Amino acid sequence: LTLRVVDFHVHPIPRIISEKELLREVELAGVDVAVLLALDVDSYHLEDKRTLIKFLEECIEYSNLNCLSCLETIKHILQTCYTSNEYVAKLVKNNPNKFIGVGSINPSKNMSYVKEKLKEIDKLGMAGVKLIPTLQFFNPLKEKSKLEKIFEFCEEKQKIIILHTGCDPSIWEEPAFSQNANPAMLKYYASKFKRVPIILAHMGSYSRRYPGIWFDEALELGKKYSNIWFDVSAVPYLLTEERYVEKISREVGWDRVLFGSDYPV
């Protein structure tokens, strides 16, 4: 049996990289199979006046950043990063031996939208659902009915769920803005949906300012629930720094740890 190199976490963002460039980079890196993630994000959330005021108030309270400039940066990030389910499915269809596609749904939108996106992911034959509480502006415990719908779908259709855990660029580097991506928020779902593999992207650790921010919370969840998996995309220090390596070995082992690059972001 030939061991294959799998990159579990790749963003084929069309505004950043073309299909041709992505294929070339995957080949150059010696990757046999890449898992491509859709990203259902946009700035509509910030167009609601009340939401916008709340956001700016929090920005002033928690941070000394220039909040209006920060708002523009966030809008730019969201508009740039949008990657549709259809686009990812097209790349997979064009390169079936090289790519596996994972869809995305924004749970901060209404229930009928969530149901529509689940149908779309099913029809496109995608391997699972990617959720990103930071860029999608949702609290996993406050959107319980929508998240349960997504988990029930994945349970029934035998699909995976990938959840971003840790901070994110710009304002989301401030932990106060990234609390929704703390792995501790997912205990309810890990316990209720034991047959759904839940992958904690970045192992709770992604943060330039506070590396390893919720590493312990991620391990805690993984120790308790065998359906919790991890990827180490964008957090290579978890594989090289002794204190992290030892703790992973001791507390959860390596069988549920997946390699990912987060390329090209």
Regions found by a protein language model. Name each.
Residues 1-80:
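An N-terminally biased module of ancient metal coordination in phosphate/nucleic-acid-related enzymes
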Residues 15-26, 109-121, 215:
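Short, acidic/polar
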Residues 26, 92-96, 122, 190-191, ...:
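N-terminal cationic-hydrophobic initiation segments that often serve targeting/anchoring roles
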Residues 1-15, 85-105, 226-229:
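Mobile, glycine- and charge-enriched loop segments
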Residues 9, 26, 34, 88, ...:
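Conserved, mostly hydrophobic/aromatic
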Residues 56-171, 175, 234:
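Active-site gating/metal-coordination segments in enzymes
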Residues 127-128, 138-259:
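Catalytic pocket-lining loop regions of alpha/beta-barrel enzymes
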Residues 9-13, 39-41, 104-108, 132-136, ...:
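Active-site beta-loop-alpha junctions enriched in small/polar residues
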